[in-house]
Amino acid sequence: MITADNLSKSFGSHEALRGVNLTISKGEMFALIGPDGAGKSTFFRIATGLIEPTSGMMKNECLQSQGFVPQRFALYTDLSIDENLALRAQFYGVDRAVAKRRAADLLSRVGLDRFGSRLAGQLSGGMKQKLALSAALLITPSLLLLDEPTTGVDPLSRREFWTTLHQLHHDGLTIVVSTPYMDEASYATRIGFLDRGRLLATGTRQELIRSYPRTLVEVRSSDRQAVRPRLSQVPQIDDVSLFGTVLHVRGAAGVGSELIPIVQQTLAGLVAQDAIAAIEPSLEDIFVLNGDAADEAAGERAA
């Protein structure tokens, strides 16, 4: 449905996208994950035809049959929910009776059926996104694109929104969604990591985990400020990152199961041995490693 071939986009000297190659097929729920400034919104603006790439190509087979939920709420705040949907239907030439029936079904699906007369400007962030989703679905698209739809939304609304997306995908809709939240990737059938305009890796969650080439150890300690610098000095360790209340210790290339006794010896007398264990990498671990590898490769090319 969407194919990007060496896709690049620059704004002056800033490279928002750098040589992105990606294919998204019919029936997928694809999550594009990356921090602010990664290039996610630029990717969507090109996919929806709002801007042209600087070089490379993007082909969107559903350009005339797509729904789009932008990052910022783009409906009329001085119109009610019902009025916004009626206006959207009129703009796209949807029959009035058909539009009314679809709107009722959509609002019931997202839990807004009791609020049809409420002005959009009076809605909470989560309710605004549900309205934006309903507006995007009003034309029964073949492809749904959503640019960070849950950013700034409370946790309960986030969960409800993703439940709705999961139901839509189960019904056969192809969905492409961007998010800065790693935990939301579990909802997707396939994931892409985007960082500073570079597509670092793609795959299912399990494929990405299996592709992780390093040994990873978790250290649980209440004295992380003392533990972290000590580990960072060990040659067989190339990264020590804080994940919530624990440390993830990444072995250098070629370091395998011997990482655990190395960590235990380094932290002897400071951390109990049973507080040190090998773990499966999280998506954030995988993202960080791929970003580090891309930075190293770029440095080598520059040199």
Task: Identify the residue ranges that each predicted region occupies.
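Helix-to-loop junction immediately C-terminal to a conserved catalytic motif
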Residues: T48
